């Protein structure tokens, strides 16, 4: 398979088999579908019957969406090296489509870090058991006026109370009310079922008063903008969340930055 010298002489037979399978999938499935989607409009790329979903279903059936998740939760339990090799091959096939599957698991993989078993059972286990791509995630971090400023904890503005996030979570009794907007370039937003959402909880602390939640996107009050037309990487659908006004019973996973 490889056309280069393999400098890692310690790969096991399992490692090599996983890499070979991922390479074949990238060549035979990902590349042709990536070319097809690149020629489609943004709206058609995420419409019912799009080859995007055929690709996702095949990727899910091979377990690539859960490669890094431990077996105890239903994942493949791949080692870090195996996970790296799988993604290297998939991204070789097509950057956009590989990112689709990678981001599909982002909220669920990150949720494992919370250690909350109730939430893991509610969100992670069903995702791992899914083999038809009917459950997928995205990461709603960027905002129209801020980009991904909420990640820049080392910058002076991070603690500036004048810097207001565009998606706010306000505590009312035992519930949080989410109100605001995310950017028009949230990858996988047009079709994701859940989002890992970065938002602002305490505006008096600036971006430092932020947190994270896992948001089911079928809740009343969640609106999505139109799919984004792009010059390049058209095989990675992007879109917008706007006007989120949702009485959310709990903010499942929050922490002060």
Mark where each language-model region is.
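A short core secondary-structure module
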Residues: 175, 179-223
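Short Gly/Pro-enriched turn/cap motifs at secondary-structure boundaries
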Residues: 156-160, 186-187, 203-204, 229-235
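Short Ser/Thr-interspersed hydrophobic loop/turn segments at strand-loop and sheet-helix junctions
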Residues: 63, 86-91, 215-219, 243-247
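A gly/ser-rich beta-alpha-beta helix-loop segment of oxidoreductase catalytic cores
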Residues: 135-170
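Core alpha/beta catalytic barrel or barrel-like domain that forms the active/cofactor pocket
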Residues: 34, 97-104, 136-143
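Flexible, small-/acidic-enriched active-site or ligand-binding loops
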Residues: 218-252
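N-terminal glycine-rich flavin-associated loop
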Residues: 98-120, 150
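Amphipathic, small/basic residue-rich leader segments at the start of a protein or domain
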Residues: 1-101, 122-130
């Amino acid at each position: 398979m490889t056309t280069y010298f393999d400098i890692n002489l310690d790969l096991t037979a399992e490692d090599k088999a996983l890499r070979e399978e991922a390479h074949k999938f990238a060549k035979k499935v990902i590349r042709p579908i990536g070319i097809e989607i690149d020629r489609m409009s943004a709206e058609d790329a995420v419409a019912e019957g799009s080859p995007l979903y055929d690709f996702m279903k095949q990727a899910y059936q091979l377990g690539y969406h859960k490669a890094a998740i431990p077996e105890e939760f239903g994942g493949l339990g791949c080692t870090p090296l195996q996970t790296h090799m799988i993604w290297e091959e998939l991204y070789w096939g097509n950057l956009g489509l590989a990112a689709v599957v990678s981001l599909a698991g982002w909220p669920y993989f990150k949720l494992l870090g919370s250690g909350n078993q109730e939430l893991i059972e509610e969100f992670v286990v069903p995702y791992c058991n899914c083999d038809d791509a009917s459950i997928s995630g995205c990461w709603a971090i960027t905002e129209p006026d801020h980009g991904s400023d909420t990640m820049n904890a080392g910058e002076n503005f991070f603690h500036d109370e004048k810097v207001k996030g565009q998606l706010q979570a306000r505590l009312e009794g035992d519930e949080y009310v989410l109100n605001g907007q995310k950017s028009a370039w949230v990858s996988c937003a047009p079709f994701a079922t859940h989002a890992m959402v970065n938002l602002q909880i305490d505006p008096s602390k600036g971006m430092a008063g932020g947190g994270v939640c896992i948001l089911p996107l079928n809740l009343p009050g969640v609106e999505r903008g139109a799919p984004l037309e792009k010059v390049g990487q058209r095989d990675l659908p992007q879109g917008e969340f706007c006007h989120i006004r949702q009485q959310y019973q709990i903010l499942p996973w929050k922490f002060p930055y």
